[in-house]
């Protein structure tokens, strides 16, 4: 499970930026939190709102860049241990509007849980070269942190969890050492970290191949889950079939004891979008994965979007700690009946054209109090109270809202 992600000098983001899945102490939707006996609770959902060009997509691209940088070499050499749902390699591009930043490295740090341990992985890239890289771990609830490896340029230091005598410390400067170890060795701590990175789903609607592989899995129980989910949102299908010869999907309906088929192309847009989104969402819920989707609301009707969000927040459905991170423009779901205040985030540019993010929980009113959990979030957002400059500086500082 993702706890926290930080990055610096990536596209529209110049300074260190942190997105946090660690739950605050607020009471709303406490039953939906991902809880561990010895660790702080995590959020099952995170949504990012904001104006076009504010940096919503670039935040997701930063996380996707880190994931793909680690996973791509493993995948290309067919050393993956998990079913990888990632479509393309994303390059680390520095901040646009500063000559010094263009020459500086892009930095990433991800803090996550896998198995019984917590890991903190850092990666710094300048051009195509790895400048710095490190991996540290500790047991969940533990206090002692151990180094797995630390890399500065060509110098690599190994921790006690790795048998130093048999490990090659000479690696291509363009390849993450984490990827190198995953490809060439069977080291338990590396395998666990590798599995987390490989489990992350970066949803790309431009390439449906991965969805098709999931949707037409031989696992009949999985196919039934897809049909049940469609039925839950009043899409009355009894099954589906894929014609390999014609490469065409057909939905099936049972009417008076007889099965009728309809070409996917003849379905309504809402049905098409739901069928397109469901495979990776259900896979994430079934296996406890993180799924990252840009503009999820553009793919789904508001009713369907609310349904998808509810799946991740329902502990009876989300039994393995799946998480959903997405961007949205949809105001109908920006409500206290859908999200906690720490699940709602905003991305906007400041006066220096640098993207910044902040959560609804962080915003202070003029009396220095936080936004109330009973507030009409969508209404106040449209009034400009949660928006970009000139409101941003005043709100975070507890200034005047007008």
Where does each model-flagged region fall?
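Pre-Walker A-like glycine/lysine-rich segment at the N-terminus of P-loop NTPase domains
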Residues: 2-68
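Electropositive, glycine-dotted interaction segments
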Residues: 116-242
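Phosphate-binding glycine-rich loops of NTP-binding sites
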Residues: 41-91, 274-275, 280, 311
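Short, hydrophobic/aromatic-rich segments at coil-to-beta transitions
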Residues: 1-4, 102-110, 131
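Short beta-strand segments that buttress and anchor functional surface loops
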Residues: 108-113, 251-253
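Conserved ABC ATPase signature
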Residues: 44-51, 242-282, 290-303
């Amino acid at each position: 499970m993702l706890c926290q992600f930080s990055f610096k000098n990536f596209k529209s983001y110049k300074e260190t930026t942190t997105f946090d899945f660690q739950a605050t102490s607020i009471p709303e939707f406490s039953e939906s939190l991902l809880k561990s006996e010895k660790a702080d609770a995590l959020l099952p959902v995170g949504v990012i709102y904001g104006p076009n060009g504010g940096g919503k997509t670039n935040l997701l691209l930063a996380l996707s860049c880190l994931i793909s940088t680690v996973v791509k070499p493993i995948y290309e050499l067919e050393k993956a241990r998990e079913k990888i749902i990632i479509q393309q390699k994303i390059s680390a591009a520095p901040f646009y509007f500063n000559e010094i930043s263009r020459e500086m490295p892009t930095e990433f740090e991800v803090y996550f849980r896998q198995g019984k341990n917590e890991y903190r992985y850092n990666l710094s890239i300048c051009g195509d070269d790895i400048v710095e890289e490190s991996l540290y771990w500790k047991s969940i609830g533990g206090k002692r942190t151990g180094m797995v490896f630390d890399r500065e340029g060509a110098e690599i230091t190994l921790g006690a969890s790795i048998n130093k005598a048999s490990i090659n410390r000479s690696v291509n400067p363009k390849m993450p050492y984490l990827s190198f170890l995953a490809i060439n060795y069977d080291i338990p701590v590396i395998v666990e970290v590798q599995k987390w990175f490989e489990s992350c789903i970066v949803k790309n609607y431009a390439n449906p191949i991965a969805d098709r592989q999931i949707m037409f899995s031989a696992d009949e129980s999985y196919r039934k889950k897809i049909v049940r989910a469609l039925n839950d949102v009043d899409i009355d299908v009894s099954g589906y079939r894929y014609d390999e010869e014609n490469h065409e999907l057909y939905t099936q309906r049972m009417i008076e004891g007889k099965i009728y088929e309809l070409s996917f192309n003849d379905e309504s847009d809402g049905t098409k979008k739901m069928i397109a989104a469901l495979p990776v969402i259900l896979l994430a819920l079934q296996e406890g994965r993180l799924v990252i989707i840009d503009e999820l609301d553009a793919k789904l009707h508001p009713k369907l979007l609310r349904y998808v969000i509810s799946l991740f927040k329902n502990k009876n459905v989300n039994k393995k700690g799946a998480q959903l991170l997405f961007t949205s423009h949809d105001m109908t779901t920006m409500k206290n009946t859908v999200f906690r205040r720490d699940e709602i985030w905003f991305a906007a540019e400041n006066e220096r054209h640098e993207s910044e993010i902040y959560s609804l929980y962080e915003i202070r009113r003029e009396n220095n109090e936080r936004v109330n959990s009973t507030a009409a979030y969508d209404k106040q957002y449209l009034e400009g109270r949660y928006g970009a400059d000139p409101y941003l500086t005043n709100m975070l500082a507890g200034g005047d809202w007008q």
